[in-house]
Amino acid sequence: MAKTLYEKLFDAHVVYEAAGETPILYINRHLIHEVTSPQAFDGLRVAGRQVRQIGKTFGTMDHSISTQVRDVNKLEGQAKIQVLELAKNCEANGISLFDMQTKEQGIVHVMGPEQGLTLPGMTIVCGDSHTATHGAFGALAFGIGTSEVEHVLATQTLKQARAKSMKVEVRGKVNPGITAKDIVLAIIGKTTMAGGTGHVVEFCGEAIRNLSMEGRMTVCNMAIEFGAKAGLVAPDETTFAYLKDRPHAPKGKDWDDAVEYWTTLKSDDDAVFDSVVVLEAKDIAPQVTWGTNPGQVIGIDQVVPNPQEMADPVTKASAEKALAYIGLDANTDMKNIPVDQVFIGSCTNSRIEDLRAAAAVMKGRKKADNVKRVLVVPGSGLVKEQAEKEGLDKIFIEAGAEWRNPGCSMCLGMNDDRLGEWERCASTSNRNFEGRQGRNGRTHLVSPAMAAAAAMFGKFVDIRHVELN
């Protein structure tokens, strides 16, 4: 029987299944951070249980840490408690931890692939909704709750119902200036923020195949933003080249054997998907969100939609509420919207490719006077090291940006990088919900190049018309 890639991955990891019961999956890799793991370890202690397979779990610090200092003792309140608890729990259980004293530390979804912890064919979980990022490698990766974190620590398994399969095909080549972020925002704009609900999505087509691994991670990262359980890209030579010689990747004959297996990880030609979505790559323009969910997005060359022209009453009401919060009028030209802050970072867009794209725009330019702050936050210590080796940090600083240490930073209002009330931000992150970047902050999701251009020109501009250096 023909199978989709998702079905192959799921079936390969079922350790127990009975009629009328939810299947139990084996979990190959468990990634943890400081926010969703403390209660899980407390649960283990209360129950008198131990971590079942120590070598399958890896931790890092990212969500609540400061990107300005690397000293745990200078953290305050809940952030300090969370970070110290993670360190204590990892030490007590023999779990490998990339803490703030190591250059390998970083955002969990940047660190995992860098270290070769993310491999094709794996099941990967983390107490974080953007775990779908790792699906870019042909791994079944999804976010779990804290009680499930405890369950995986104790058993290395997880109850998981089968999802439906969706294929999203992006046909042809994108035009110059169009990035992975634009592709995935265009997908979400077409499907809406709930279009993938109940599905695991496989991204395919020439435009997806042409992406680097960094780009594929950006696409899979945002699968959750249109309701999908996970996102997948079948592994290929691009995948293998990225993973070769990574610290935790197989070596020697084990590598050869692994690649032989990984090449089988693809949907069968006659596999049947429950849903199919098709986009033409040539039609995708640089994307900017105008509302308060990632599905409220349009091309930079368009105007803010008019709710009065929306036939569906629910869509209309949602748009009216979003525009009231975001402070925009219908029919406003997207190129006439000024910004107060710019954030380049997050698990969506903080890899070296993203920083290079931003630097190409910012080189030789200065931050616009109306832009109060530009934060550039690398996704890991290794990304930071590489960027500094290439001199990107100097480009950012000379342009008027702040060059920070790795962490989740302004993606979410959980640390000391936040928007002021009613400030408008061009952000490379993944969510533009109300208050996501700080109380009453207004977030517009864009690509790194678009964010950098907004910083330099003080408003959203069409990156296709900006000279790159």
UniProtKB/Swiss-Prot annotation:
The reactions it catalyses are: (2R,3S)-3-isopropylmalate = (2S)-2-isopropylmalate
Report which superkingdom the organism of origin falls in: Bacteria
Binding-site residues, [4Fe-4S] cluster: 347, 408, 411
Q: What's the cofactor?
A: [4Fe-4S] cluster
User: What high-level taxonomic lineage is stated for the organism?
Assistant: Bacteria, Pseudomonadati, Pseudomonadota, Gammaproteobacteria, Pasteurellales
Pfam family, any one? Aconitase
PANTHER family reported for this sequence: 3-ISOPROPYLMALATE DEHYDRATASE, HOMOACONITASE, MITOCHONDRIAL-RELATED
> How does this protein assemble?
Heterodimer of LeuC and LeuD.
* Name of the protein this chain belongs to: 3-isopropylmalate dehydratase large subunit
Explain the purpose of this protein: Catalyzes the isomerization between 2-isopropylmalate and 3-isopropylmalate, via the formation of 2-isopropylmaleate.
Record family assignment = Belongs to the aconitase/IPM isomerase family. LeuC type 1 subfamily.
Q: What is its EC number?
A: 4.2.1.33
Keyword annotations for this protein, in alphabetical order, are:
4Fe-4S, Amino-acid biosynthesis, Branched-chain amino acid biosynthesis, Iron, Iron-sulfur, Leucine biosynthesis, Lyase, Metal-binding
- Keyword Glycoprotein appears in the UniProt entry: no
The record's cofactor note says: Binds 1 [4Fe-4S] cluster per subunit.
Pathway assignment reads: Amino-acid biosynthesis; L-leucine biosynthesis; L-leucine from 3-methyl-2-oxobutanoate: step 2/4
What are the recorded GO MF terms, alphabetically? 3-isopropylmalate dehydratase activity; 4 iron, 4 sulfur cluster binding; metal ion binding
Q: Name one GO biological process term.
A: L-leucine biosynthetic process
PROSITE patterns assigned: ACONITASE_1, ACONITASE_2
| Provenance organism | Actinobacillus pleuropneumoniae serotype 5b (strain L20)
